[in-house]
Amino acid sequence: MELITILEKTVSPDRLELEAAQKFLERAAVENLPTFLVELSRVLANPGNSQVARVAAGLQIKNSLTSKDPDIKAQYQQRWLAIDANARREVKNYVLQTLGTETYRPSSASQCVAGIACAEIPVNQWPELIPQLVANVTNPNSTEHMKESTLEAIGYICQDIDPEQLQDKSNEILTAIIQGMRKEEPSNNVKLAATNALLNSLEFTKANFDKESERHFIMQVVCEATQCPDTRVRVAALQNLVKIMSLYYQYMETYMGPALFAITIEAMKSDIDEVALQGIEFWSNVCDEEMDLAIEASEAAEQGRPPEHTSKFYAKGALQYLVPILTQTLTKQDENDDDDDWNPCKAAGVCLMLLATCCEDDIVPHVLPFIKEHIKNPDWRYRDAAVMAFGCILEGPEPSQLKPLVIQAMPTLIELMKDPSVVVRDTAAWTVGRICELLPEAAINDVYLAPLLQCLIEGLSAEPRVASNVCWAFSSLAEAAYEAADVADDQEEPATYCLSSSFELIVQKLLETTDRPDGHQNNLRSSAYESLMEIVKNSAKDCYPAVQKTTLVIMERLQQVLQMESHIQSTSDRIQFNDLQSLLCATLQNVLRKVQHQDALQISDVVMASLLRMFQSTAGSGGVQEDALMAVSTLVEVLGGEFLKYMEAFKPFLGIGLKNYAEYQVCLAAVGLVGDLCRALQSNIIPFCDEVMQLLLENLGNENVHRSVKPQILSVFGDIALAIGGEFKKYLEVVLNTLQQASQAQVDKSDYDMVDYLNELRESCLEAYTGIVQGLKGDQENVHPDVMLVQPRVEFILSFIDHIAGDEDHTDGVVACAAGLIGDLCTAFGKDVLKLVEARPMIHELLTEGRRSKTNKAKTLATWATKELRKLKNQA
């Protein structure tokens, strides 16, 4: 009884009662989990107990079996499997008995069954479960509640378990699901549970989709369910079609004409948002699939082979029907629309963009009449839809086809930036931004640039949602203007460009925008800072005085922000404060990159003092630490060897960054900075190396360090060796052993992420070896004898390269590094290398691949390495 009372108190409005109940349950779980779970399952299984107690008991069981965090979930599953088999059997019997006895939804028992199943099925336990669940659904005497909760359990299992674990059960599971979906099933609740279960099972029913008769049957049942009068079932059935289209595109031709086309077009026209959304999503998915198929076709053509799968061009064929519905849907905006609400109007915009990318030129004649007819419509909804449609089709069709249309539309768009409706102004600003990004020649022409700049500068004072889009337009415009400027051959940046005359005003207005009191709305503040960064980055020489001024403003702001820290009261203040620090650091990086060396020397003391203050105050915020480390990196780049005077003061914070592996982005930034310091300070970094090397080696040996940090550390060993030359000898043995271990790493080849990671790891090992060989051999004509310390490892290094050559997943980056290292080994060790390479013909194939590579680095290094090998051959 006591347990029931306590479970009922888990929903108590009295906070003390509630906390006491939670503490009791936590203690019970720790003291004796098996007994506790058996007791809970007893409470759950007894229909005489209150609904509150049963739901709470189910929740406790479920939460002891599963978690959103995959690592914790795996621990819980192991903990469950370690419980005595009798106790587990008792819990399983009780939760199975509960199915069908609950009068509330969703069923708690179904979640418990799924939690246990996901732990036991992968280790071949509980074999009787799936047959039992199938029997519950197919037994003609089962109640509605029994069928519904059982199908929910099946759905949860399918959702959470690795599809491979259920492959051999797919027929039975599918039988139960289809049974619940049939149009003869009287209960819509059962139909809904079955349709949701099907949605979760589609990944592992591939064998059933491969068989024509079974596929016909599944498709028939799903299509019938899309006509169910219950909206919930209709939406779930449409979700199935959306997913089937992605998974089984190749099989859809039979169903497209007779069924899918009509069903989805009808759904798109529905007044019920959820239904319309699925209809639109279906065609967005068709576009995604057909774009992938287009890429596959062009790759196959390049390699002179037929593609594995071909596109049926459904999107192109449906344009004339889809576009009118989508443009009509664009007119259903909500005036005070919240950015986060996904609705048919937004989905229609995305679908139009995908259609434009997928069907290219073919879409223009279908959309143009709507734009022309409504861009000056007195009803703001139609004006907005016309501008939106125009913005959506700018990417995909040939620029040459769009350019005359855009130039013709420019005066109207500039006018619409001052429209009485804020929605129209917002969309017009977005469309102008898209034009600046995708068809900049239309924006930077002599006729429209001046009026466009005028209207954009005014737009910065508009509502946050409009101003935010204007900021983005400025970013794209600056980049386009910079690329279009004339550059003298020997110069890196143009002397002047088309934004020069308005540059100072634009920068001033953007700085004012970053200070707007409503800057936290619609990301306006960060958009304005990002725009400022782009404009400074893409500025011509004659804008330099304005860049100098901006640098001083940013430095002043950084100091002001650091003084505000003591006044922070609330968490939301702290978040805004941290965001502002990060934005200022990022902006500082961009202005520093533009500042000339002698100017940088004048301001570096103040900049460094601010950054050091930031490190002292932000011990708690990883994001800010990361941005501050990146800003130091930029200062190091700009100052070069002159940075040495700050090293003593900065050293402790570099150490803190390297130790902060819990926030691995911070650690990555610190490791990257070590590389920059090596390049800038060269041998002057020697006094700091012992400490840095110790921290780097500790991180490599610590399994809690995020895996992405490790390749960067290996690569930085090469930077250190290159900087300190012979002084690296004292670290050589331990580093070479570490590299030998790392270069033998193996991963699961079916996991693409791990294949990428392996390439990263290998590239870093090669970079490290390269730095060590170059550092020890020195840059004099005669090779320094120190390099002979590496000689015993040369054969291993070449075997490693040979192993890479034989792995077809290697990247261009790996090929480039391997080729560079081969060349360095030739110059350091001479004819010994030749013998070892000759014995490994795969290495020659790797160099041939490098010489034919499309990336410059691989081509250059492979050609050089081949020449070095040839030299040795001629000497021999």
UniProtKB/Swiss-Prot annotation:
Query: Quick one: where's region Ran-GTP binding?
Result: 334-419
Predominant localisation class: cytoplasm
* Keyword Cytoplasm listed: yes
> Where on the chain is N6-acetyllysine found, per UniProt?
211, 835, 867
Region of interest called IAB-binding, as start-end residue ranges on this chain: 329-342
Q: PTMs?
A: Mono-ADP-ribosylated by PARP16.
Looking at the record, the residues that make up the Importin N-terminal domain are 21-101
**Region Essential for high affinity interaction with RPL23A: which residues?**
286-462
Record PROSITE patterns: HEAT_REPEAT, IMPORTIN_B_NT
- Stored SMART domains: ARM, IBN_N
**Classification via Pfam families:** HEAT_EZ, IBN_N
Annotated keywords: Acetylation, ADP-ribosylation, Cytoplasm, Host-virus interaction, Nucleus, Phosphoprotein, Protein transport, Repeat, Transport
Report the InterPro entries cross-referenced here: ARM-like, ARM-type_fold, Armadillo, HEAT_type_2, Importin-beta_N, Importin_beta
Q: Which positions bear N-acetylmethionine?
A: 1
Its biological function? Functions in nuclear protein import, either in association with an adapter protein, like an importin-alpha subunit, which binds to nuclear localization signals (NLS) in cargo substrates, or by acting as autonomous nuclear transport receptor. Acting autonomously, serves itself as NLS receptor. Docking of the importin/substrate complex to the nuclear pore complex (NPC) is mediated by KPNB1 through binding to nucleoporin FxFG repeats and the complex is subsequently translocated through the pore by an energy requiring, Ran-dependent mechanism. (Microbial infection) In case of HIV-1 infection, binds and mediates the nuclear import of HIV-1 Rev.
**Quaternary structure (record):** Forms a complex with an importin alpha subunit. Interacts with XPO1. Forms a heterodimer with IPO7. The KPNB1/IPO7 heterodimer interacts with H1 histone. Interacts with SNUPN. Interacts with H2A, H2B, H3 and H4 histones. Component of an import snRNP complex composed of KPNB1, SNUPN, SMN1 and ZNF259. Component of a nuclear export receptor complex composed of KPNB1, Ran, SNUPN and XPO1. Interacts with SRY. Interacts with PRKCI/atypical protein kinase C iota. Interacts with KPNA2. Interacts with KPNA7. Interacts with SNAI1 (via zinc fingers) and SNAI2 (via zinc fingers).
The record's similarity note reads: Belongs to the importin beta family. Importin beta-1 subfamily.
**Protein name per its UniProtKB record:** Importin subunit beta-1
- Report which gene this protein is encoded by: KPNB1
